[in-house]
Amino acid sequence: MNKKMTDYVIDLVEVLNKQQKQIFWGFFDIASMVLSIIVSYILFYGLINPAPVDYVIYTGLTFIFYQIMIGFWGLNASISRYSKITDFMKIFFGVTISSILSYIICYAFLPLFSVRFIVLFILLTTFLILLPRITWQLIYSRRKKGNGEGEHRRTFLIGAGDGGALFMNSYQHPTSDLELVGILDNDEKKKGQKLGKIPVLGSYDDLPELAKRFRVEKVIVAIPSLDPSEYERILQMCNHIGLKCYKMPMIESVVQGIQPPIGGFQKIDITDLLGRKEIRLDESRLGSEITGKTILVTGAGGSIGSEICRQVSRFNPERVILLGHGENSIYLIYHELIRKFQEIDFVPVIADIQDYDRLLQVFEQYEPAIVYHAAAHKHVPMMERNPKEAFKNNILGTYNVARAVDAARVPKMVMISTDKAVNPPNVMGATKRVAELIVTGFNQRSQSTYCAVRFGNVLGSRGSVIPVFERQIAEGGPVTVTDFRMTRYFMTIPEASRLVIHAGAYAKDGEVFILDMGKPVRIYDLAKKMVLLSGHTENEIPIVGVGIRPGEKLYEELLVSTELVDNQVMDKIFVGKVNVMPLEMIDQKIEEFRTMQGSELKRAIISFANETTHAD
């Protein structure tokens, strides 16, 4: 097979999903067994007769038992680039046990097989099953080397605890491009000891000196619980001496087989330096809320909407409706999800939330159990310039979704709000505050349950400052912040999405749910950490203040004092109770807004939002 053909086959197999890989390897396995039974027959009897039914039954039983065993061991789709000797041993035992079980069953009815025949069959089958897998690894490894990826890089591992031990268990596999020369750990008792065959050379502080002595090119952090300040210190040392710094995937992802310990390295990102650990919530009651049901997400192509779709799909709903206005973003999330979750029915729907009739038609057709309303305009300065669009999308759009939920008798609606809805000085925050009023207004009148979810800035979302900083750093700076005093609450996209899903499970009576996001972060500190992550210093990439933009606040709030309640639905999730306004009054106010334009509309919405926030 020439190089082009080899590359073609590798690329073809690499894009297969889990189910398709099972079929791919299953084809090789059954072919190996058929060939083994034929060869064994020829060697024992010296000729080929038409295959007796006995041998067909024996081969079929062996294949069924074998598939059950390797499926139990999780090997039916995983034998590829990251296989270990233990995986190959399991295949041998799987073939052996399956063959013996089939022999016992067949011998009771068809005493035609000798023990020598079965032994030969086991050896031939094991050889033929392992041959394509080992060949696959060798070809893939050689291809990596041909692409310049296979050069061994001298590497330090940071962490001699559980994470380091898990790393070492998978270190010696054929596609690794690492040459591990030492381990660093701050536990003095571990210095001089070995993890596997690799010595613990010293502490983190010894990194610059030891890296120079051992000519190290790369550092891998294998401590999932490492304090953010320690991450930052290690990163500063690596930047100073020109080392690349990576982290091992989360232990949970490695244990569950989502990512390999080797080859799944990630660069240290901003979430590692934020000063708090990512919040994970109790998911015990989400299965009954989602499993087997139809879920609809508006704004499904956006940063939050798409992550809600991913998180919801983990709980095996029957169907997920991906509703959005942008065809390209819906197309992308649709094709991502159908690859990852083949058993779920994903339905892409192009629709505008400003079109009530279209929404009602979709809701009545698919009968969702929960609607997650993520579609909204979120950019503060942009909405200051376009207040009419903020009104149409965030207020009218939310009203249409809530009204369609009521009319179609959808059991629950969860609306995504923002901390900018609290005491809003800008039109974006004000429209989201009015959207909260719409949700609570419908909750008072409808048989459906409505709730809202407030959270702060979402790291990595389209409206986040992170992509802006990344672009400015890539262009050589400067990095611009509006005011060095400005602070914001931050959370990750998965955190925000999990909160939204939990809100749906705990919603009862028009609540506003808020996640404990820790302390607010100075935007200036965030910018400094981003520069550090890029491998530069502030002398190379300066950070400058440009002044507060229209509609921005120095500080954000999550609740005003009148919205606080005493209870928590669960750890890290607080409940607020917003002032409720009769839906008839909201209808009247919306009609007034329809007649306004520009600055008049902006002032009216902001004034109304603040009046309702502080009303008794």
Mark where each language-model region is.
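Conserved Rossmann-fold cofactor-binding substructure of NAD(P)-dependent oxidoreductases
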Residues: I350-I370
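N-terminal Rossmann NAD(P)H-binding glycine-rich loop of SDR-like oxidoreductase domains
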Residues: I295-S313
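Proline-aspartate-enriched helix->loop->beta-strand connector
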Residues: A211, R215-E217, P317-E318, F363, ...
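A solvent-exposed beta-alpha-beta segment
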Residues: Y45-N49, I139-G257, N328-L332, R339, ...
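Conserved Rossmann-fold NAD(P)-dependent oxidoreductase catalytic core, especially the SDR/UDP-sugar
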Residues: I241, Q256-G257, H373, H377-E436, ...
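Signature of alpha-helical transmembrane segments in polytopic membrane proteins
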Residues: M1-G150, H240, K247, V371
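Flexible, Lys/Arg-rich cytosolic regulatory linkers and terminal tails that connect or flank
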Residues: N2-Y8, Y231-T294
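Strand-loop microenvironment adjacent to phosphate/nucleotide-handling motifs in alpha/beta enzyme folds
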Residues: R280, R285-E289, G441-N457, R462-D616
